[in-house]
From Swiss-Prot:
UniProt key word Ligase: no
UniProt xrefs under InterPro entries: Ribosomal_bL36, Ribosomal_bL36_sp
Similarity annotation: Belongs to the bacterial ribosomal protein bL36 family.
Protein name: Large ribosomal subunit protein bL36
Gene symbol of the encoding locus: rpmJ
Length: 38
């Protein structure tokens, strides 16, 4: 999981969601694309 100031979807399978006030990117195709805003 990457922690970044700005999270963006990196492919068509990436979804931006908000959990407990934190923006996250989850990806069903490439788990490598997981990101968290921090």
């Amino acid at each position: 999981m990457k922690v970044q100031a700005s999270v963006k979807p990196r492919c068509e399978y990436c979804r931006v969601i908000k959990r407990k006030g934190v923006l996250r990117v989850i990806c069903s195709r490439q788990p490598k694309h997981k990101q968290r805003q921090g």
